[in-house]
């Protein structure tokens, strides 16, 4: 699954955006994906996952949109995840938490490829290629 830098959310609810990845996902699977993606803030919104998000995620910050897009990608079946500057709008602390969560949950289970200008990713990498 490819996750680009830009916002890829569609108009609807956060839940509908997540379910695009896997329509049969359970509530627990949706919540786990949000937790791993450091998007637990969703559960604090007045309507939780049923909170609306406009086209391109309007109503949410760019960093929030990125984390929801990552959560959606985590719901897709498959063994490869490609994050292309997908944490660019996150503050360093949130980025580190997300990277830690991904490592703890998927290390050895999925191949995760980070394309990034940030050095935070390096400590979670098995291999680093600099171009």
Where are these regions (language model features)?
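ABC-family ATPase nucleotide-binding domain "signature/switch" substructure
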Residues: 1-6, 14-17, 33, 51-131
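Conserved "ABC signature" C-loop
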Residues: 7-52
